[in-house]
Design a protein with these regions (language model features):
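Catalytic loop of the DD-peptidase/beta-lactamase superfamily, centered on the K-T-G motif
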Residues: 3-180
Length: 180
């Protein structure tokens, strides 16, 4: 392993502007699940919280081999929303500089999930969050880690060969006649 310096995220702005920890984000999730209240105190008015959790636009194709019972897939003010086994899931994921996170909550179940990883080359964060939801809902076990890994492996299977081909083609190009 090689330690990398922590870099500033100022240049990517809102894309990765939350620098936080699990303890603080857990408080944020509790606030989301309790209509803007935290520890019995109204921090953000419920109409404001509700507005962020309403659908503002439809997102892509809802049909999925992995989740064939999905009925909607929308986006609100910063939150993706979809149904999963009869409940509305609200989520947002993101990442930068080698970190990827997933925040999910299901108001009907009073369930919030945070997954923080220090990798961005796979979908472990999504697999783990879905595994937790299934266990919480007492759904039959599915090995999402294996499912998502196979999808990742299939998607990246030809990467090394493609890079080698690109390098070979670049190396075969005419060289400049004068020194650079």
């Amino acid at each position: 392993l090689t330690e990398l310096p922590f870099t500033s995220i100022e240049s990517i702005g809102p894309c990765a502007s939350i620098n936080s920890c699990v303890a603080d984000m857990a408080q944020w999730l509790l606030l989301q699940l309790d209509s803007g209240r935290l520890n019995g105190r109204q921090i953000i008015p419920w109409p404001v919280i509700r507005e962020t959790q309403l659908s503002a636009m439809v997102e892509g194709d809802i049909h999925s081999k992995l989740f064939p019972a999905k009925h909607f897939n929308t986006y609100g003010l910063g939150w993706a929303m979809y149904d999963y086994n009869g409940v509305k899931v609200i989520e947002h994921g993101g990442g930068a500089n080698g970190f990827v996170t997933k925040t999910k909550f299901i108001p009907e179940l009073n369930l919030g999930i945070l997954v923080y990883t220090n990798t961005d080359a796979n979908s472990l964060y999504e697999a783990l969050a879905t595994q937790i939801i299934d266990a919480y809902m007492h759904l039959p076990y599915r090995n999402y880690s294996d499912i998502y890994y196979k999808r990742y492996a299939n998607a990246t299977a030809g990467d090394d060969a493609q890079l080698a081909d690109y390098k070979k083609r670049v190396d075969a190009m005419a060289k400049p006649t004068l020194p650079l």
